[in-house]
């Protein structure tokens, strides 16, 4: 890609997201989504090969369908209310269609099929943009319309996403697909608490972006995309490989790591709102994600035979390019649990 074009494309992506987040006019929100979608496609095709082309096509078709549904919901709401701006009273049909459109953009179950395929087909940098920045615009609109969202629909999709996010990752060897299924599960956790405490959804999103960005940055540092290459990186970069495995456990929600904090707060909030059965189901479904993360950690670090040349630690390590912000990111992504009392007071 031309170095002069890339900053313009990234600026358009950010501008599209910001338009969605700050607008109160439905047409401007739809335009922001379209700007964002059309600008992110060249980013997905940055590595020009058939797999990235296929991934970009799948992304375009899914997002175009979601945009069509969103416009349909906007028109139905316009016929019902007579105005283009946000209103507290929204037509129930428009609310359901809009929720379906936004969850399709997010990648919630049962509209999750595109997320692993697209993430696997693109580079690590494009995957990072797809699984972090691209979640901001749909979640900001869901946050705004939270009072009128159909609770049965969003809670059903949430629990389904958490279960599929766990089941889907069980037999994966590709790290990008594992992170894609992790994203589906995390989106399920975020949307489950949306109708009870929207602020907690934003806090969960912040922690999710922090952990996912750190994990992708570590993958980029050692240039690893599969579990096999991760285990082979052990003797070259033991510290970074250890950090990757700890980050995986944090994403799975193992206490006392940072990833446990949002799950703990969401379960507490659901219990407070007399949704004990839902909270129990979500906690059980979260064990699926934690299981495959722990299995990956065990297989990579604890089952290596110590005398093979492939696994011996080298005396002199290869010099690798390290990001200066990596150390604070790792600390924040693993050791934020002591801040739980302050975060609970804020909520």
UniProtKB/Swiss-Prot annotation:
GO annotations of cellular component type: mitochondrial inner membrane
Location(s), subcellular: Mitochondrion inner membrane
Q: Quickly give the catalysed reaction.
A: a ubiquinone + NADH + 5 H(+)(in) = a ubiquinol + NAD(+) + 4 H(+)(out)
> GO biological process: any one?
mitochondrial electron transport, NADH to ubiquinone
EC annotation?
Answer: 7.1.1.2
Which GO molecular function annotation, any one, does this entry have? NADH dehydrogenase (ubiquinone) activity
Spell out the subunit comment. Core subunit of respiratory chain NADH dehydrogenase (Complex I) which is composed of 45 different subunits. Interacts with TMEM242.
What family does the entry list? Belongs to the complex I subunit 2 family.
Task: State its role.
Answer: Core subunit of the mitochondrial membrane respiratory chain NADH dehydrogenase (Complex I) which catalyzes electron transfer from NADH through the respiratory chain, using ubiquinone as an electron acceptor. Essential for the catalytic activity and assembly of complex I.
| Protein name as it appears in the record | NADH-ubiquinone oxidoreductase chain 2
The record lists the organism as Peropteryx macrotis
